[in-house]
């Protein structure tokens, strides 16, 4: 009987210790899981990067609070930028050619620090990544060319000649073609990305600047700065199939993820034209602040962020109501563009 009581006691003690160890393991695993989820949540958080031309920096905006949470120094006169498809890097063009910039700053989005600087051509402006993230195309406005950067080595591997004073660049979703606006020749160069050569030239309006391609790849929307219009190019035929009148001096275009609406900042009339892409008509005009230049849509399509160059602010537009619901202050001098992760 005594032996049995001892065995029972040892059994209970052993079970209690095992339960404690098990509980400790579960607690540790829970903490690790919460930490991992916190990291994933931080990485997945929607953030806007705003190059500020006169401050030689990039403001980082938390889109949940619409406040500036960081400022990243870059080189002279940053003008535009693009987010890598995996969301890990932002490429920012530094256009201060007079001061010897002519470069691209590579920002790590986890640390919000510049991890590389890539020399490119004279007066780099527009930049875009291929959909697979393998290459970035940088438009060199004073060199009438496009620098092709291998994103793995962060080096220029090719240079493509285009029209005069090129500005913007956008890819078809399959990555087969890049569309580049040429301001001085009033046209768009179509680049075959396999051969890295121009295969078509599409006449558009006067002084084309920014552009984007619809999510289905069927059309390219081109902002014509001096024509106060947007040219709609069929990517199947590389011809203009529609021209949409907008506000004064439109500068760029962003399209919602569902492809239903195009948002066009008009820096001469201090507003944003909203185009219904099914009818190619303006269905709303949204007043913002002085000299709107850049625009980007959040991944869920709920908001458009518009940089106001002279006001030194960013207007936050609710795309459901097409009204300004917030204004981001403190983004420094001359915000030129918006890039959203």
Regions found by a protein language model. Give the residues of each.
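N-terminal secretory signal peptides that target proteins for export/translocation
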Residues: 1-23
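Predominantly soluble domains enriched in secretory-pathway, periplasmic, or organellar proteins
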Residues: 33, 37-341
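Sec-dependent N-terminal signal peptides
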Residues: 19-34
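Intrinsic disorder/low-complexity segments in short proteins, especially the signal peptide
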Residues: 6, 28, 39-42
């Amino acid at each position: 009987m005594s032996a049995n009581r001892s065995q029972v006691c040892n059994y209970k003690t052993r079970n209690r210790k095992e339960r404690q160890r098990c509980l400790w393991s579960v607690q540790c695993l829970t903490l690790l899981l919460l930490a991992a989820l916190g990291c994933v949540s931080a990485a997945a958080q929607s953030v806007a990067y705003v190059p500020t031309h006169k401050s030689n920096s990039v403001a980082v905006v938390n889109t949940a609070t619409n406040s500036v949470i960081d400022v990243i120094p870059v080189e002279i006169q940053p003008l535009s930028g693009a987010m890598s498809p995996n969301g890990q890097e932002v490429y920012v063009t530094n256009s201060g050619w007079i001061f010897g910039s002519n470069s691209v700053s590579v920002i790590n989005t986890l640390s919000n620090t510049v991890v590389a600087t890539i020399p490119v051509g004279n007066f780099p402006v527009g930049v875009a990544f291929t959909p697979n993230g393998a290459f970035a195309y940088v438009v060199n406005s004073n060199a009438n060319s496009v620098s092709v950067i291998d994103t793995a080595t962060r080096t220029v591997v090719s240079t493509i000649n285009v029209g005069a004073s090129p500005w913007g660049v956008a890819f078809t979703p399959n990555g087969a073609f890049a569309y580049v606006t040429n301001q001085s020749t009033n046209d768009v160069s179509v680049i075959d990305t396999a051969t890295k050569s121009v295969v078509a030239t599409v006449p558009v309006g006067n002084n084309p600047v920014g552009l984007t391609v619809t999510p289905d790849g069927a059309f390219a929307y081109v902002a014509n700065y001096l024509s106060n219009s947007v040219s709609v190019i069929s990517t199947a035929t590389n011809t203009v199939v529609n021209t949409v009148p907008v506000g004064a001096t439109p500068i760029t275009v962003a399209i919602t993820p569902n492809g239903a609406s195009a948002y066009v900042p008009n820096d001469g009339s201090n507003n944003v034209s909203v185009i219904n892409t099914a009818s190619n008509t303006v269905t709303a005009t949204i007043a913002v602040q002085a000299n709107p230049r850049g625009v980007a849509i959040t991944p869920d399509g709920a908001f458009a962020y518009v940089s106001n160059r002279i006001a030194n602010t960013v207007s936050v537009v609710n795309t459901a109501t097409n009204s300004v619901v917030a204004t981001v202050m403190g983004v420094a001098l001359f915000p030129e563009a918006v890039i959203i992760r």
